[in-house]
UniProtKB/Swiss-Prot annotation:
It holds the Pfam family Oxidored_q2. It catalyses: a plastoquinone + NADH + (n+1) H(+)(in) = a plastoquinol + NAD(+) + n H(+)(out); a plastoquinone + NADPH + (n+1) H(+)(in) = a plastoquinol + NADP(+) + n H(+)(out). NCBIfam families: PRK05715.1-2, PRK05715.1-3, PRK05715.1-4, PRK05715.1-5. Its EC number is 7.1.1.-. This is NAD(P)H-quinone oxidoreductase subunit 4L, chloroplastic. GO terms for cellular component: chloroplast thylakoid membrane; NADH dehydrogenase complex. GO terms for biological process: ATP synthesis coupled electron transport; photosynthesis, light reaction. It comes from Chlorokybus atmophyticus. The gene is ndhE. NDH is composed of at least 16 different subunits, 5 of which are encoded in the nucleus. The chain crosses the membrane at residues 2-22, 32-52, 64-84. Belongs to the complex I subunit 4L family.
Length: 101
């Protein structure tokens, strides 16, 4: 029963992340949506790892690696957003096309 609840939670978080990724024009919101997608994957790893074999912690270890990668991705993404904001004075995704002036 708990696996069903966790899978529904992960699917809803994933759908919220996809919706935010598709509809948002703000780069910060897009970055937050990507983090939601990664968190949904983490929930799935932990849920299936606990369901299949509760003694082994492979799912939790993979989840920690994903969180580490997500933290690095967020830091690099925010640094890029800050650099582009200083140049363009906006965080709108339409203004990031560097081929147009």
């Amino acid at each position: 029963m708990i696996l069903d609840s966790l899978l529904i939670l992960a699917a809803s978080v994933f759908c919220i992340g996809i919706y935010g990724l598709i509809t948002s024009r703000n780069v910060v919101r897009i970055l937050m949506s990507l983090e939601l997608l990664l968190n949904a994957v983490n929930i799935n790893f932990v849920a299936f790892s606990n369901f299949i074999d509760s003694i082994e912690i492979k799912g939790q270890v993979i989840s920690i690696f994903i969180m580490t990668i997500a933290a690095a991705e967020a830091a690099v993404g925010l640094a890029l957003i800050l650099a582009i904001y200083r140049n363009r004075d906006t965080v709108d995704i339409e203004s990031f096309n560097l081929l147009k002036r």
